[in-house]
């Protein structure tokens, strides 16, 4: 038996009805396949918060200016941001990675490509070479974390304007209209939402990103931190590390990674169904069904780390002593179709 088959065998011998922990069981089996062992262990885990700024902020697509990206990154480094507080519940270490903030922040991991992207409503957000460089930096980040002993990585992001970039990418990759999937991000007004839709439509009309070339989409309307997350998802497959998907920005990065390398999907764990409208379509495209439906849209990886306490509880049962053999009774057998 391979690792996944061994993990399923283990679940079938835990003293409970078959498949009664539902998607949690499926995730544990998936992690066994990623880690290539049925002795699933995710005790050492981290959240990588990818930070970057966006030139499209100049179009009035966000309530805040780019200076807020650096302020939140400072809070992450200091351990006081929302993600730090939520991650502490599950013993998750948090790192901020600078893929391209306008203002560098001491204490972040340096993955910088440039001081923010260009305004995609006027010109391509970045060059293809820059996109490739950021993706590689994300892959390298997974390698570094694996070398430090981390067994699982949650993704997150911080970048004012990045829901605009990620929605533009989703429109291109899914061949749909900004009218259909553009959300309010961090609480835009009606006027702000219209500016956001207009900026996305303008970028798509000017640059014609190629839906069949994910790197082209990423370079023309993406962001450095989004590209970094694409690399993290690709790195998960390469280095046998489970990677948790967060909200809409992370989901777009996951979709982009799958378009680049379809096999990378096997190392991705969906966490929650964000209330951003694009997420439903992306998860459908990926064939994924997130466990948590809490209308979260905070970002920073907060949705991703919310999955960890649930996984920890499932693994307590998976590794626990409460088995049919221990109790001296026969295991349940599938009854579907039996008289």
Q: What residues fall within each predicted segment?
A:
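N-terminal loops that bind phosphate or other acidic moieties
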Residues: 1-339
């Amino acid at each position: 038996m391979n690792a996944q088959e061994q993990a399923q065998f283990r679940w079938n011998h835990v003293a409970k009805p078959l498949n009664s922990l539902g998607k949690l069981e499926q995730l544990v089996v998936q992690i066994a396949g990623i880690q290539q062992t049925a002795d699933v262990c995710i005790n050492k885990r981290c959240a990588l918060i990818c930070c970057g700024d966006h030139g499209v902020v100049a179009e009035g697509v966000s309530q805040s200016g780019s200076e807020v990206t650096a302020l939140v990154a400072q809070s992450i480094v200091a351990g006081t941001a929302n993600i730090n507080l939520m991650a502490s519940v599950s013993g998750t270490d948090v790192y901020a990675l600078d893929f391209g903030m306008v203002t560098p922040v001491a204490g972040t991991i340096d993955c910088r490509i440039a001081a923010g992207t260009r305004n995609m409503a006027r010109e391509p957000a970045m060059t293809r070479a820059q996109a490739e460089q950021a993706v590689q930096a994300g892959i390298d980040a997974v390698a570094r974390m694996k070398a430090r002993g981390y067994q699982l990585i949650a993704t997150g992001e911080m970048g004012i304007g990045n829901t605009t970039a990620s929605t533009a990418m989703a429109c291109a990759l899914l061949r749909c209209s900004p009218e259909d999937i553009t959300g309010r991000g961090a609480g835009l007004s009606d006027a702000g939402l219209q500016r956001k839709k207009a900026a996305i439509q303008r970028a798509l009309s000017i640059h014609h990103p190629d839906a069949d070339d994910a790197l082209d989409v990423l370079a023309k309307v993406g962001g450095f931190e989004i590209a970094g997350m694409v690399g993290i998802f690709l790195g998960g497959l390469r280095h046998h590390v489970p990677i948790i998907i967060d909200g809409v920005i992370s989901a777009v990065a996951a979709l982009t990674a799958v378009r680049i390398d379809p096999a990378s999907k096997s190392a991705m764990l969906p966490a929650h169904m964000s209330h951003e409208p694009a997420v439903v379509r992306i998860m459908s495209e990926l064939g994924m069904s997130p466990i948590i439906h809490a209308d979260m849209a905070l970002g920073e990886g907060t949705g991703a780390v919310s999955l960890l306490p649930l996984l920890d509880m499932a693994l307590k049962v998976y590794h626990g002593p409460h088995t049919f053999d221990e109790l001296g009774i026969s295991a349940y057998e599938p009854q579907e179709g039996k008289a």
